[in-house]
UniProtKB/Swiss-Prot annotation:
Keywords, in A-Z order: Isomerase, Nucleus, Rotamase, Transferase, Ubl conjugation pathway
Gene Ontology CC: catalytic step 2 spliceosome
Name of protein: Peptidyl-prolyl cis-trans isomerase-like 2
Originating organism: Mycosarcoma maydis
Compartments in which it is found: Nucleus
Alphabetical list of PANTHER family matching this protein: PEPTIDYL-PROLYL CIS-TRANS ISOMERASE-RELATED, RING-TYPE E3 UBIQUITIN-PROTEIN LIGASE PPIL2
GO annotation (BP), single: protein ubiquitination
Length: 582
């Protein structure tokens, strides 16, 4: 069978005395078995502490990774000696490794998206520190002679490629052959003198301090980039009634993308885009087209009473109302007045180039919404902008119908008095400066009063609803306890629910009992109702006779009902009835 083979169910004499004994003839086999028995250090573990690292670094001549918080104290304690090779290693030559994660939180190649394993051939680029599979660098860099980083596009040479893990040479990662293990160079917690990676040796000076400062500045963005995709998928939304109400009609598109791209994990469930609270509020207000808000602008020429179309332009109206409540329009000027066209204001700077929304950014237009209002008459309130989706705080009021502005500006309100508004007429009569259209006489908004706000009413209802359903609220707990006691009082120890004392329920119960008694007058048993009734033959009677019979039948029925009610109230269990209770 051959020496050293293991395909027999017994040990030969040579094997017993050699490989598994102490025979010198099998020393080569014994050495191979001893060498294969070690466990190489994984690429995601520190070669000093043999624990997973959080800030991986390495040297240019050796790609074995170290934890930064372990490497710096080690080099300071043992005079810049490389922990693995024993050569000199200065902090100026430290290379920060950047490893990217996939949706499952596992490290992968940022180009081919293949996951790293314990037997993957990994290399890093010295300039950027990005870690790739050797196959990716060989196919996309070395063979086409494209010597630029595939992620950052930084130029590099072949000597800048650092081998992080080579499965064909695991002996390079043998922990027993490392310099600090063979020489017992141990690092204690007292040597570290740190609490976290953000407090690494705050007293370091020179190149050490310079390196740490650079790493602190780059650590957070790099970690954010590396886990951008994983953090998105890791955030799981618990499906509740509230979250279902916040789900929009469009999906995230990840289901289709996962079946199109092989780099994404297949998904079979469609995930809806979750709207924020404001978008949910806008959808609710939009579902009620008659929702209106009312604002009173007090100017030095008089008051302007405005009606806002919240059901047609909810986002624009909400922005306008919030600016009014926060006093952003108080003491502002109408900086542009064109008689026969419009008057414009809403800029706190009074120059026509300022103003911002409540979100401190421009927001979308709403003139394409179904049923949107048009610039068709005098006294229309509309948003001023600098182009598509550039609404902020400036608005204008028209002096006449201007249909050429339809589809360019969002109409979100009107003057209550319309073309008969006396204040607007006075403002139109103020002359303007040639070239700038600035009024020669100051037209100022002195005060703003919001008299009705459907958004505030909606938010108040939401707060009340949330409080009513809050398990931690004392009122909710008292209500649930009262309901529980009432339910326990109505249920016997056999699980039977007792009849309620509600008047309607009592009336229904009495009517049911009367019907049962009436049925028992012509049938026996609850299953003989259809066959127990006496069959009568239809006879064509004289009209007078028919009227007499009907009168007699009514009297008989009235007497029967009275007797049945009396019997039911007196003693329902006095007779056998129709045996339906048996």
């Amino acid at each position: 069978m051959g020496h050293g083979k293991s395909d027999r169910p017994f040990l030969s004499a040579a094997e017993h005395s050699g490989v598994y004994g102490a025979h010198s003839a099998s020393s080569g086999k014994a050495g191979a078995l001893e060498q294969a028995s070690f466990h190489p250090v994984s690429y995601d573990c520190c070669a000093i502490s043999f624990q997973p690292w959080s800030v991986p670094v390495c040297s240019p001549d050796c790609g074995i990774a170290f934890e930064l918080t372990n490497l710096i104290p080690f080099l300071r304690k043992f005079s810049s000696v490389h922990p693995v090779t024993g050569k000199r290693f200065d902090l100026d030559n430290v290379v920060r490794l950047n490893l990217h994660k996939n949706q499952h939180g596992r490290f992968h190649d940022p180009v081919s998206f293949k996951e790293f394993g314990q037997h993957s051939h990994l290399v890093a680029i010295r300039q950027s520190g990005n870690v790739f599979l050797w196959d990716t660098v060989q196919r996309l860099n070395l063979k086409p002679k494209y010597m630029k980083d595939l992620v950052t596009d930084q130029a590099f040479t072949k000597s800048d490629i650092i081998t992080v893990q080579d499965p064909e040479h695991p002996e390079h990662r043998n922990p027993s052959e490392m310099h600090h293990v063979k020489n017992a160079l141990k690092l204690t917690q007292a040597d570290k003198g740190i609490d976290s990676s953000q407090q690494i040796n705050m007293g370091a000076i020179g190149s050490t301090h310079k390196l740490l400062s650079t790493l602190r500045e780059t650590t957070q963005p790099d970690m954010h980039t590396a886990s951008a995709s994983s953090s998105t998928s890791a955030s799981k939304h618990t499906t509740t009634a509230y979250s279902r109400n916040k789900a929009s009609g469009s999906s995230t598109g990840m289901t289709a993308a996962s079946f199109t791209s092989s780099s994404l994990t297949p998904r079979t469930a469609i995930e809806r885009v979750i709207l924020d609270d404001e978008e949910v509020m806008f959808s609710h207000i939009k579902s009620r087209p008659s929702s209106k808000a009312y604002v009173r602008l007090s100017t030095n020429f008089g008051a302007l009473n405005l009606e806002l179309h919240c059901g047609k332009a909810p986002k624009t109206c909400f922005n306008f109302l919030q600016l009014c409540k926060h006093g952003k329009y108080d003491d502002t000027l109408f900086h542009r007045n064109i008689p026969g066209f419009m008057i414009q204001g809403g800029d706190p700077t009074g120059t026509g180039r300022g103003g911002s929304s409540i979100w401190n950014s421009n927001f979308r237009d709403e003139f394409n919404e179904p049923g949107a209002f048009k610039h068709d008459t005098r006294g229309v309130l509309s948003m001023a902008n600098k182009g598509k989706d550039t609404n902020a705080s400036q608005f204008f009021i028209t002096y006449r119908g201007v249909p050429h502005l339809d589809g360019k500006h969002t109409v979100f309100g009107r003057l209550v008095d319309g073309d008969k508004d006396a204040t607007l007429t006075k403002m139109e009569q103020v002359p303007s400066e040639q070239g700038t259209d600035r009024p020669l006489k100051k037209i100022q908004i002195q005060d703003v009063l919001v008299t009705e706000d459907p958004f505030e009413q909606y938010q108040l209802r939401q707060k009340q609803s949330a409080k009513a359903n809050d398990p931690t609220d004392p009122e909710y707990q008292r209500r649930m306890e009262k309901r529980k006691r009432r339910q326990n009082d109505r249920t016997t120890w056999l699980g039977t629910e007792l009849p309620t004392n509600h008047p309607e329920a009592q009336q229904k119960q009495s009517e049911t009992k009367i019907d049962n008694l009436l049925v028992g007058s012509w049938s026996v048993g609850k299953y003989l109702n259809s066959t127990g009734r006496p069959r009568t033959k239809t006879i064509q009677a004289h009209p007078a006779r028919k009227e007499h019979d009907e009168s007699a039948a009514k009297k008989t029925k009235t007497n029967t009902n009275a007797i049945a009610i009396a019997n039911a109230n007196a003693n329902a269990n006095a007779g056998f009835g129709d045996f339906s209770a048996w």
